[in-house]
Amino acid sequence: MMGINERKGFDFEYYQRNLLLQEKGFPTPKATSTGTTIVGVIAKDCIVLGADTRATAGPIIADKNCKKLHLISPNIWCAGAGTAADTEFVTSMISSNIELHSLYTNRKPRVVTALTMLKQHLFRYQGHIGAYLVLGGYDCKGPHLFTIAAHGSSDKLPYVALGSGSLAAISVLETKYQPDLERHEAMELVKEAIEAGIFNDLGSGSNCDLVVIDEEKATPYRGYSKPNERATKQSKYTYDRGTTAVLKEDIYKFVTVQDLDEMQVDV
């Protein structure tokens, strides 16, 4: 039997408290956000997902090597943009549910199954879960690539880009994407799109991570590209003789001898 003070469901008391504190001028805490550029491309016989590795908290870089590619199942991966905690926990929860579904049905999970679970969960919260996802995988029906917005809407496209750097990334994809790309071509295209977001968006930065999903397995590439790698500062720089080419040589005599007339002195 439930006690008198026992509550079920949502409790909105803290919501009213937060509004009152905000009206009195107290600053609201900022969630860690993955400013982000995430990209997905369907290739000839695989799916390639990519993401940068910068996480921000307002104007501050909170993490330089954040992991934005999440494992849903061995044949399904997800790239996340938005609030870092939301993307982490939503993908972790769906990964657990997909594993239970796979054990119950005794077969390899479908990509649309993960898509449906994510859409239903996000729609239930009407966008208050800040997770914007690129879902990619390879199942019995072939390769699939979807985008999922925080409100629960989705799209199925051959190439996608999400996040604050998506405008720069999608310009690269629209220019260079072709159907039936080879594996290495798709990887280089995704890398170039991510780097476009890194160099043209302050919320994206650091390294480029990739994952390639084919019919047999998924292969992640952590730190596939490091366009902003910082070198160790040396105390003394030395260069080999001949490093700098000599373009022109002029020789000047700084010591000159001049003959002068003897000075006459009146006595």
From Swiss-Prot:
It comes from the Eukaryota. Keywords: Cytoplasm, Hydrolase, Nucleus, Protease, Proteasome, Threonine protease, Zymogen. One of its GO terms (cellular component) is cytosol. It is found in: Cytoplasm; Nucleus. It catalyses: Cleavage of peptide bonds with very broad specificity. One of its GO terms (biological process) is proteasome-mediated ubiquitin-dependent protein catabolic process. GO terms for molecular function: endopeptidase activity; threonine-type endopeptidase activity. Its EC number is 3.4.25.1. It is an enzyme of class 3 (hydrolase). SUPFAM superfamilies: N-terminal nucleophile aminohydrolases (Ntn hydrolases) (SSF56235). The active site is at 36 (nucleophile). The keyword Metal-binding does not apply. Transmembrane segments: none annotated. Residues 1-35 form a propeptide. InterPro entries: Ntn_hydrolases_N, Proteasome_bsu_C, Proteasome_bsu_CS, Proteasome_sua/b, Proteasome_suB-type. Its main location: cytoplasm. The 26S proteasome consists of a 20S proteasome core and two 19S regulatory subunits. The 20S proteasome core is composed of 28 subunits that are arranged in four stacked rings, resulting in a barrel-shaped structure. The two end rings are each formed by seven alpha subunits, and the two central rings are each formed by seven beta subunits. The catalytic chamber with the active sites is on the inside of the barrel. The proteasome is a multicatalytic proteinase complex which is characterized by its ability to cleave peptides with Arg, Phe, Tyr, Leu, and Glu adjacent to the leaving group at neutral or slightly basic pH. The proteasome has an ATP-dependent proteolytic activity (Potential). Belongs to the peptidase T1B family. PANTHER family: METALLOPROTEASE TLDD, PROTEASOME SUBUNIT BETA TYPE-7. This is Probable proteasome subunit beta type-2. The gene is pup1.
